[in-house]
């Protein structure tokens, strides 16, 4: 088990998609109306707060669902959670996860281990770039940020190095329990549960966005 920050390793695989200057993050849940919309929009919000001057084409953040409610709006409680964080919920429509989404993605972050398994089962060499959100957070925390390329080299270059380093840590840095890698589904739950899930997602995203950008986030 890793005992401290590790360098960003090479040779652990890389994204299958995108040009050298573009990095795509795909968030996956079941219906694409609760967890993955919250995660997508909180990721965008956090990136914009830290990298306001980075072209939008450098980091593209999307989401889809394994049983996606194609064309549906996000749940009202999900939109309310985003409003709590000051994040934009407008213009969202649900999508069903397709092969093309996985092919294009440089990093796939799922709500649960079952979602991760479903993405990997689609093929497209997705295994080395697909993690649950909380799994990726745990691995990222063990990576020495000083070993990642500086932001001056481009945010996409830094992001790809981060994914390679995280993939190299698999099997060495295990979850304390299977449930530790899960974000539970709030579908149909009251707003209080949605808010607890929103906080959980935000806390998991913070070290990921910090590692991607090299910028610590402002306090909420």
Enumerate the predicted regions with their spans.
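Conserved active-site segments centered on acidic
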Residues: 1-105, 113-128, 210-219
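Phosphate-binding/catalytic loops
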Residues: 2-9, 13-15, 120-220
């Amino acid at each position: 088990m890793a005992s401290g920050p590790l360098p960003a390793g090479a040779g652990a695989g890389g994204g299958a998609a995108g040009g050298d200057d573009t990095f795509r993050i795909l968030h996956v849940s079941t219906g694409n109306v609760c967890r993955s919309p919250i995660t997508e929009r909180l990721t965008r919000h956090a990136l914009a707060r830290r990298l306001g001057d980075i072209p939008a084409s450098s980091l593209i953040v999307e989401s889809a669902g394994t049983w996606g409610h194609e064309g549906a709006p996000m749940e009202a409680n999900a939109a309310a959670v985003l409003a709590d964080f000051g994040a934009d919920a407008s213009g969202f429509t649900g999508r069903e996860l397709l092969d093309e989404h996985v092919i294009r993605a440089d990093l796939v972050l799922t709500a649960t281990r079952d979602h991760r398994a479903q993405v990997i089962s689609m093929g497209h060499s997705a295994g080395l770039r697909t993690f649950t959100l909380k799994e990726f957070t745990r691995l990222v925390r063990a990576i020495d940020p000083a070993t990642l390329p500086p932001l001056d080299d481009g945010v996409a270059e830094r992001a790809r190095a981060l994914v390679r380093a995280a993939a190299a840590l698999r099997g060495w840095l295990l979850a304390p329990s299977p449930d530790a890698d899960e974000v539970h589904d709030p579908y149909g739950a009251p707003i209080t549960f949605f808010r607890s899930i929103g906080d959980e997602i935000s806390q998991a995203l913070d070290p990921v966005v910090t590692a991607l950008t090299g910028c610590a986030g402002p306090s909420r």
